[in-house]
Each structure stands twice: as structure tokens, then as C-alpha cells.
Amino acid sequence: MSEALPFPSNKTSTPECNLKTLYWACVHNDLAELQARLDAGVSPEEASQVDSNGRTGLMVACYHGFGSIVALLSCCPFLDVNQQDKDGNTALMLAAQAGHMSLVTLLLNYFAGLDLERRDQRGLTALMKAAIQDRSECVVALLMAGADLSSVDPVRGKTALEWAVLTDSFDTAQKIRQLLRRPQAEQLSLHYQPEWPALAQLVAQAQAQAQAPAAPSLLERLQATLSLSFAQSPQEGGVLDHLVTVTTSLASPFLSTACHTLCPDHPPKLGTRGKSVPELLGTAPPPPPEPHPPQQVPVPQVFAPNQSPQSMFSQWLQSRDSTRSQVPKILLSKAPSPSARYELTLRPQGQQSLAPPVWRFQERKKKEEETEPRGGGLGQAGGSK
């Protein structure tokens, strides 16, 4: 019996999915397998393994929102966090445009050497892609991490704020304008005083009203009776805004008991790039190896017989002063049928109009009429009657 030949399958599979590599663990969100692969040691080839779309395991995890996988990959050696797929997307771009705020924060704080200004094939950065998709929280995180708000794309020449306005991302545009008014998180510095600036003025105003109470007028009473209270957004610099600022400051018990800052003298500021946690602690994993230039495979040139290499190019690519021999062109046309032939009579001198053509049947009929006797025509006509 003959053995059946194996035919290639049309299904696209992940690289070495049967060996459970680093990429396999990231795609299947298998935290235990990923930890086992990291404990066993990861080679540079395994860390940079990609699929048919050019995406690494980190990119796939950022795209699907696998937070535990991304957090564990921060300790992976030889991992290039700025690696791009076939469309030019990085892991930060995929997480930002998908709206995974926690993954964007992980990438910004725990991955050393993260490039915020890397562009895709269309010239868009992670900040622009997040602004187009109206991911306001991701936009705020990128701006406070040092993303450049003034950078423009090479096609339309628009910034992230202009892209947000153009794509009707009103929430993102509002958050960007608020950051421009307050570009620094003052509550994350040691010099912050948890006092409400407007408190002294409001207390003095209340005391003045208590000392000299004035009876409300009829109009004020009418307005107080007929006015309706609706839910409003918290005002900037108001009570609720101050409450959030105090509870998120370094002096707040909510933060002091849970975490501590590594650089209290340098709070986050708009447009200022800070160092990641591994860079501050000196525990950054080994950087990825430098990419080697792709090897150019020589392509054999096959020419048609009895033709020069120059004849393989199009006619408009060849030089006009070429002295090579031109191949004659032969055009074949079908001869007209005999019944369609006609002759043109020469135009008499002195006439400017064209003479109509004389057909052969008209010429024969005219000759027959000339050969017949002039009087015989009437006799024949009478005899026939």
C-alpha cells in the first residue's frame, strides 16, 4: 500500500504552538506556563517570536487586555517593548487605542526604555491613536508620562488635540484642556499643603453674612421657591475637586499605607518624561539584542531568448536615444466585401462641393438605359399591357 502524502493545511497556526513557548502562554493567557517559561530561561529568539501579523506575545496580551500576563512580562529578559508589527503598531499603541488603562499604566511604569513617540505606518503615535478612539483616561496617562502634545502626523499635520476635536472626542478634548490649565500634579510632592485655597474667602463671607443678616427680598424668595436643582458636574477648584486632590496626595492615609513614591521631589508633569520603576531601582532586565539587517537573498534574473535585458523594461523606461534595433510592427486588417466597394468620381474643376459616389449597380443600370432604343420602351410597355 502506498503512503498518503501530507498536504499543507490552509489554517494559520501560532508559531510552535505544540511546544508551549512564551508566545503560546501569552496568547492563551496561561499565567502558570508563562512563569514556568521565565523560570526556565528565555532566549532572545523566543522573546522576539512573532505570529503571521508580526505581533509578539506582549502585543497580543495588550490587545486582549491580559493584565497578569503583561505584569509578568515586565521581568522577561531580551523583550523589546518597542517592537512593531506589520502595521507599525507597538504594544503601547494596541493597549492605548483599545482603552486598557491599567495596561497603559503598567507599560509606562514598569517597562524600561518605552518609546512614547514611536509612529506606525500612517505616522500616528500612541497619543494620537488614543485621542482618535476617545480613550480619555489613556490620553491623560500618556500626557502625564511625557508624551509630546505638540507633535503632528505627517499626513494631515494635526496634533492629538486637533484629532480629538476632528473625531468628536469631546471628553478627550476636555481632559486635555484641563491638563493644560493644571499641568502638574502638585498633590504628589512633599511640599503640598492639604488646604483649600478658597476656604478662607468663603469663611469670611459666611461670617459677614451672619453678623449683618439681611432679609431676603421678594424676588429672592420667589427664585428660591421656583428654582429646580439639577445634577451638575463637579466644578474645577470646587469642594469635590479639592476632596479628590487631598485623598490622592502623599499625605493621605489612602496612599501612605498602601505605597510610597520613589521620587517625591519630581511629581508628574505634563510633557515631562519620568523614569520607570525598574530604572529607578536598577532592576531593569537585559535589553534586547540589536536587530541584524535582513539578509538579501539574490533573485535570479531570467531573460527571454533572443532578447536583450533592456527589452525587458517598458517602453517609457527606456532612453529615447537608444540605438537598439526596433522590432517592426505588422498590422493586419480584413479586406472589405465586394458589395461594399464604391468609386469616387473626380470633382469637376470650378465646383467646390464634393461629388456623391457612383455605385456599380447604378453604373450598370445607366449603361442599360443608354443601350436600349428610345422608342422601344413605349412599345414594350404597351405590349405588356
UniProtKB/Swiss-Prot annotation:
Region ranges (Disordered): 270-385
Ranges of Polar residues composition bias in the record: 304-326
Keyword flag Cytoplasm: yes
Compositionally biased spans, kind Gly residues: 374-385
An individual GO BP term: skeletal muscle cell differentiation
Annotated disulfide bonds: none
Gene Ontology cellular-component terms listed: cytosol; nucleus
Comp. bias regions, Pro residues: 284-297
Keyword terms, alphabetized: ANK repeat, Cytoplasm, Nucleus, Repeat
Pfam families tied to this protein: Ank_2
Ranges for the ANK repeats: 17-46, 53-83, 87-116, 122-151, 156-190
UniProt tissue specificity: Isoform 1: Expressed predominantly in the retina. Isoform 2: Expressed in the pineal gland.
Gene3D superfamilies: Ankyrin repeat-containing domain
Entry-linked InterPro entries: Ankyrin_rpt, Ankyrin_rpt-contain_sf
Taxonomy, superkingdom: Eukaryota
Bias (Basic and acidic residues): 361-373
SUPFAM superfamilies with a match to the protein in the record: Ankyrin repeat (SSF48403)
Coiled coil: none
PANTHER family: ANKYRIN REPEAT CONTAINING, PHOTORECEPTOR ANKYRIN REPEAT PROTEIN
Protein name (Swiss-Prot/TrEMBL): Photoreceptor ankyrin repeat protein
